[in-house]
Protein backbone atom coordinates (compact mmCIF):
# COMPACT_ATOMS: atom_id res chain seq x y z
CA UNK A 1 0.00 0.00 0.00
CA UNK A 2 1.64 3.23 -1.15
CA UNK A 3 -0.11 5.19 1.62
CA UNK A 4 1.28 2.95 4.37
CA UNK A 5 3.75 4.72 6.68
CA UNK A 6 7.42 3.98 6.06
CA UNK A 7 10.66 5.17 7.65
CA UNK A 8 13.00 7.04 5.32
CA UNK A 9 16.42 8.58 5.82
CA UNK A 10 16.27 12.19 4.61
CA UNK A 11 19.25 14.50 4.14
CA UNK A 12 19.55 17.96 5.63
CA UNK A 13 17.26 20.44 3.85
CA UNK A 14 16.94 24.23 3.84
CA UNK A 15 13.82 26.32 3.57
CA UNK A 16 12.32 29.80 3.83
CA UNK A 17 9.36 30.02 6.21
CA UNK A 18 6.71 32.48 7.33
CA UNK A 19 4.41 32.18 10.34
CA UNK A 20 0.79 31.12 10.04
CA UNK A 21 -1.81 32.79 12.19
CA UNK A 22 -4.97 31.36 13.70
CA UNK A 23 -7.38 33.17 11.38
CA UNK A 24 -5.31 32.68 8.20
CA UNK A 25 -6.84 31.22 5.09
CA UNK A 26 -4.47 29.16 2.94
CA UNK A 27 -4.33 32.08 0.50
CA UNK A 28 -3.11 34.40 3.29
CA UNK A 29 -0.18 32.08 3.97
CA UNK A 30 0.69 31.88 0.27
CA UNK A 31 0.63 35.67 -0.11
CA UNK A 32 2.81 36.14 3.00
CA UNK A 33 5.38 33.64 1.70
CA UNK A 34 5.41 35.21 -1.79
CA UNK A 35 6.04 38.61 -0.19
CA UNK A 36 8.86 37.19 1.96
CA UNK A 37 10.45 35.54 -1.10
CA UNK A 38 10.35 38.88 -2.90
CA UNK A 39 11.83 40.77 0.05
CA UNK A 40 14.63 38.24 0.59
CA UNK A 41 16.16 38.94 -2.80
CA UNK A 42 17.27 35.33 -3.23
CA UNK A 43 17.47 34.28 -6.88
CA UNK A 44 14.32 32.37 -7.90
CA UNK A 45 16.51 29.53 -9.18
CA UNK A 46 17.42 28.81 -5.55
CA UNK A 47 13.85 27.78 -4.71
CA UNK A 48 12.49 24.32 -5.29
CA UNK A 49 8.86 23.97 -6.30
CA UNK A 50 7.73 22.14 -3.19
CA UNK A 51 5.81 23.95 -0.48
CA UNK A 52 4.98 22.66 2.95
CA UNK A 53 3.70 23.34 6.42
CA UNK A 54 5.13 22.80 9.87
CA UNK A 55 2.28 21.37 11.88
CA UNK A 56 1.84 20.31 15.49
CA UNK A 57 1.40 16.68 16.42
CA UNK A 58 -1.35 17.49 18.93
CA UNK A 59 -3.44 19.41 16.36
CA UNK A 60 -2.86 16.61 13.83
CA UNK A 61 -4.21 14.08 16.35
CA UNK A 62 -7.27 16.29 16.85
CA UNK A 63 -7.83 16.28 13.06
CA UNK A 64 -7.24 20.03 12.89
CA UNK A 65 -5.17 21.59 10.13
CA UNK A 66 -3.69 24.60 11.91
CA UNK A 67 -0.15 25.00 10.59
CA UNK A 68 2.44 26.93 12.57
CA UNK A 69 4.56 27.84 9.52
CA UNK A 70 4.34 27.75 5.72
CA UNK A 71 7.57 27.17 3.82
CA UNK A 72 9.31 26.58 0.50
CA UNK A 73 12.46 24.49 0.07
CA UNK A 74 15.74 25.90 -1.18
CA UNK A 75 18.02 23.77 -3.35
CA UNK A 76 21.05 24.61 -1.21
CA UNK A 77 22.16 26.41 1.92
CA UNK A 78 22.26 30.21 1.69
CA UNK A 79 23.87 32.43 4.29
CA UNK A 80 23.04 35.91 5.47
CA UNK A 81 19.28 35.79 5.00
CA UNK A 82 16.63 35.87 7.70
CA UNK A 83 13.88 33.26 7.97
CA UNK A 84 16.08 30.60 6.34
CA UNK A 85 16.11 27.41 8.40
CA UNK A 86 17.48 23.89 8.29
CA UNK A 87 15.65 20.59 8.65
CA UNK A 88 17.93 18.02 10.25
CA UNK A 89 19.19 14.93 8.50
CA UNK A 90 17.66 11.86 10.04
CA UNK A 91 15.02 9.16 10.08
CA UNK A 92 11.51 10.34 9.25
CA UNK A 93 8.21 8.50 9.37
CA UNK A 94 6.58 9.32 6.01
CA UNK A 95 3.05 8.73 4.78
CA UNK A 96 0.32 10.30 2.66
CA UNK A 97 -2.86 11.69 4.12
CA UNK A 98 -5.75 13.92 3.01
CA UNK A 99 -5.40 16.18 6.03
CA UNK A 100 -7.79 18.86 4.77
CA UNK A 101 -10.73 16.45 4.50
CA UNK A 102 -13.08 16.30 7.46
CA UNK A 103 -13.24 12.51 7.65
CA UNK A 104 -9.55 11.58 7.63
CA UNK A 105 -8.43 9.46 10.54
CA UNK A 106 -5.11 9.99 12.39
CA UNK A 107 -5.52 6.82 14.48
CA UNK A 108 -2.77 4.79 12.75
CA UNK A 109 -0.24 7.52 13.61
CA UNK A 110 -1.58 7.92 17.15
CA UNK A 111 -1.12 4.14 17.56
CA UNK A 112 2.44 4.34 16.18
CA UNK A 113 3.46 6.92 18.80
CA UNK A 114 1.55 5.39 21.70
CA UNK A 115 3.98 4.99 24.61
CA UNK A 116 6.65 7.02 22.75
CA UNK A 117 7.74 10.63 23.06
CA UNK A 118 5.50 13.05 21.18
CA UNK A 119 7.18 14.17 17.93
CA UNK A 120 8.69 17.66 17.95
CA UNK A 121 8.97 18.13 14.16
CA UNK A 122 6.11 17.34 11.81
CA UNK A 123 5.81 18.51 8.21
CA UNK A 124 3.04 18.32 5.63
CA UNK A 125 4.18 18.73 2.02
CA UNK A 126 1.96 19.75 -0.87
CA UNK A 127 2.11 17.78 -4.10
CA UNK A 128 2.27 19.89 -7.28
CA UNK A 129 -0.72 18.10 -8.81
CA UNK A 130 -2.86 19.17 -5.83
CA UNK A 131 -2.96 22.82 -6.70
CA UNK A 132 -6.36 22.56 -8.45
CA UNK A 133 -8.40 20.76 -5.78
CA UNK A 134 -6.49 21.33 -2.56
CA UNK A 135 -9.40 20.46 -0.23
CA UNK A 136 -9.15 16.78 -1.24
CA UNK A 137 -5.42 16.71 -1.85
CA UNK A 138 -2.97 14.17 -0.53
CA UNK A 139 -0.15 15.61 1.55
CA UNK A 140 3.12 13.84 2.27
CA UNK A 141 3.54 13.97 6.03
CA UNK A 142 7.06 13.63 7.47
CA UNK A 143 7.68 13.18 11.19
CA UNK A 144 11.24 13.33 12.53
CA UNK A 145 11.97 10.18 14.52
CA UNK A 146 15.74 10.50 15.03
CA UNK A 147 18.41 13.00 13.96
CA UNK A 148 21.57 11.64 12.34
Model-based region annotation:
Residues 1-148:
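A solvent-exposed interaction/effector surface
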Amino acid sequence: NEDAPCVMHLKERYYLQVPCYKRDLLADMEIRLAKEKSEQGIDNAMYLRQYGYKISYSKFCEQKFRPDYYFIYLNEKVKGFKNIYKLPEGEYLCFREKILEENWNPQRIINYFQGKEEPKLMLAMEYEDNLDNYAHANYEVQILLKKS
